[in-house]
Structure formats: structure tokens, C-alpha cells
Amino acid sequence: MLDRLTEFFFPKQVSTFASDIDNLYFFIFYSSVALFLIVVFGMVYLSIKYRHRKGEELKLTSSKDHSNLLESMFFIIPLILVSITFVWGIRSYLKMVIVPDDAIEIKVTGQSWFWTFDYPDGGTTLNELVVPSNKPVKLVLSSKDVLHSFFIPVMRSKMDCLPNRYNVMWFDATKEGVYDIFCTEYCGTGHSQMGAKVIVMQPAQYEEWASELGSEDDDLPLDELGAKLYTKKAVSYTHLTLPTTWLV
């Protein structure tokens, strides 16, 4: 039942800690719904029970001004719920911020309006993050211009990218496939087009891909190599629409 609800509300879970985040969300959601229904039901019930009816004499309610049992419940139940949420949340948070020692480190750079990914062996990809499955991946994020935010929904991973500063996030992908990456911080006219893909491969396939990364350029003529580097590194002005007043 919970798995079906998760699939309905969220993208699929493709990281080791995605289920922790989703389960915590649903715990908070259902706890809030339960408390809401209890309060609303109590208000409606008491409003109906003690409403004044025509032809009846006014009835005085009980003169009892407090209940130790009710007051204890009003304190203890929220305390238990908040304590569970705190412990659950801090454990999930620590899983998300403590990077395993054996993680593959990849540098992520945001720039208006595309992403570049620099790999340990010196290779670079544009708008395609390639990672192995069942292997922790550490992303070191920064920006060349304005504030961006790097978000992989299926990994439940999101982190801001700031100029002159490095932020770190990590994930361990559990399923091979191609998934979406978004920028979730408004960064200019091309913000909505600043998407990318994360490609999760089997470890052996990733090792083969990584060993060939960059080597395909070795035999290229210099003019073709220069054109390829320009395409990878230069800003794509096809995404840039300047107002006519800019030229005035």
C-alpha cells in the first residue's frame, strides 16, 4: 500500500536513502491528517451536541474547568510524535551528509544554462552525469556565475551551487537507467531549459566507459577537436533571448 502511494506521489526510488525520506514524509503526513481529523471531528461533535434547540431551555455545561487526563494527552502525544520525527529525521540527514570513504568524486559545475561534469581521470561531459550502480558517488558542486540548485528527484538529492564556494552531496544509485536532473533555483531566462540527465550503468560498463572517456579525441584533427571543445565549453547562445533595450 505504501509503495503504491509512494509511486503515485513521488518519482521512483533510485538511491539507498530515498525510502527513508519518503517514509518519513508519509509518517509526518499521516500524523498531521490524524491530528487534523481528531480536532475537526471534536469541534463538529461538540458543536452539534451542545447547540441550542428551539423550544428547549438553556442547559449549562459542566463546571469542570480542566482534565488531567486530557491535558496529559495533549502534551504527551505531540511530544512522542515530534520526538519520533526528530530522531528519524536526524538519522536520515546523517545518512545524506556523511559521504562514504570509497565514493567516486565528480566535480559538478553549474553555468547559465548548462551543467559540466569533471571525472577523476580528467574526462568531462556536458549535461550528462554518468555513474555506476551500487557504488557511492560524491558530487562537489560549484557555480561559475549565479546561484543554481542541482536536483535529482529519483535520488532524493538536492544541493545549491554557489559561486566561489563548494557544496557536497552524494548518492548510491540502486537501479540502472536514465533519469532527469533539474536546476531548481531561478537563474535567468534559460532556467527552465537547464536540464540534464544522470545515466546509471552497471559497474563493469561504467569502468569501460570511463576508460574510453576522452580517448576518442586522440585521433581527431585539430580543427575538429577545437570545434568539439568549443561546443562543450562555450555557452549555448541559442538559449539566450536578450531584450531589445539591451542594445540601446
Model-derived features: where do they sit?
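Short pre-active-site segment immediately N-terminal to redox-active cysteine/selenocysteine motifs
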Residues: 182, 233-234
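Extracytoplasmic/periplasmic beta-strand context in beta-sandwich domains
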Residues: 106, 148, 194-197, 246
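Conserved small/polar residues in nucleotide/adenosyl-binding loops
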Residues: 238-244
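Membrane-embedded segments
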Residues: 135-186, 190-194
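Interdomain boundary/hinge segments at the C-termini of tandem beta-sandwich modules
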Residues: 200-202
